[in-house]
Design a protein with these regions (language model features):
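Single conserved hydrophobic/aromatic residue that forms the stacking wall/gate
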Residues: 1-11
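Conserved PLP phosphate-binding loop immediately N-terminal to the Schiff-base lysine helix
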Residues: 5, 15-36
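A short helix->loop->beta-strand "cap" motif at the edges of active sites that frequently abuts
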Residues: 12-15, 42
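General beta-strand structural signal in soluble alpha/beta enzymes
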Residues: 17-21, 45-48, 54-55, 131-133, ...
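Active-site PLP attachment segment
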Residues: 38-76, 82-93
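Amphipathic alpha-helix from the class-I
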Residues: 92-107, 183-187
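Conserved PLP-dependent catalytic core of the aminotransferase class-I/II
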Residues: 98, 102-134, 154
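Non-catalytic terminal extensions of PLP-dependent enzymes
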Residues: 120-122, 126, 141-253
Length: 253
């Protein structure tokens, strides 16, 4: 609700709302997933097709909605920042992805949602590795939490990679993130479930033998707040005669 109220203030002031929905290109294709920002009143929405849809790396879309956004201005900035020699392979990949979703998207997402439901039920059987989720979340992202087990997210990440040859998206703190897509196969899901359950069983055995020291959930970590001496955008205003080349070895920061 607070987000909705905030959006209302934005609309009243006639401020264009830009949503970076890079990891949400699959939103809105099935009720199992969150709604697409284009359907929620956003003026500009950015989607990285390659992150969650079948498209080559570096393919993305920018959607312009409503009348608040100056399309000519957006095009001018794109001409300034984008290459003058675009890859036709990448553009063909975008067209292929859009055409696939237009023709077969409904069936693909129906199957995808059902496979994900089964996968999540299987993973929820673990005793120590937990599927983290909130009231509103994207079920296609598998956040594997090892909080309280004594294992770190990076340990889980590299164990899955080196021992089970499963490449996850990232790891940080006490969790690791696994990405899924409409073209994942049951064989891949089975490998993931088997690997996570085996690691979960190892955690159980280590816990009973006191080989791991549990990390308490909600433990606070103080983040240092360094003094801001100079902001990056201010560097452009420094005259050339005041600049000098400095080796990183002699740098303070």
């Amino acid at each position: 609700r607070s987000v909705s109220r905030g959006l209302g203030d934005v609309y009243k002031r006639q401020i264009p709302l830009i949503v970076d929905e890079a990891h949400g290109a699959h939103f809105g294709f099935h009720p199992y997933f969150p709604e697409n920002a284009n359907a929620k009143g956003a003026d500009v929405v950015i989607h990285s097709l390659h992150k969650t849809l079948p498209a080559p790396t570096q393919t993305a879309l920018i959607h312009l909605n409503g009348s608040l956004v100056d399309r000519t201005r957006v095009k001018n900035y794109l001409h300034m920042l984008q290459t003058s020699s675009p890859s036709y392979l990448l553009m063909a990949g975008i067209d292929g992805c859009v055409e696939l979703l237009r023709e077969k998207g409904a069936g693909l997402f129906d199957s995808y949602a059902e496979r994900l439901k089964i996968l999540r039920r299987e993973l929820e059987q673990c005793r120590y590795i937990q599927l983290a989720k909130t009231r509103q979340f994207d079920p296609s992202k598998l956040v594997l939490s090892v909080c309280g087990t004594g294992m770190s997210g990076r340990e889980l990440y590299f164990k899955l990679l080196k021992q089970y040859h499963l490449q996850l998206e990232m790891a940080a703190g006490t969790y690791a993130l696994a990405m899924t897509s409409i073209f994942d196969l049951e064989e891949g899901y089975s490998r993931l479930v088997r690997a996570v359950k085996e690691i979960d069983e190892e955690l159980f055995e280590m816990r009973t033998q006191d080989k791991y020291t549990p990390i308490e959930s909600g433990q606070k970590v103080e983040v240092p707040k360094p003094e801001v001496v100079l902001r990056s955008w201010e560097l452009t205003d420094i005259p050339i005669e005041r600049r000098k080349r400095q080796s990183w070895k002699d740098s303070v920061g």
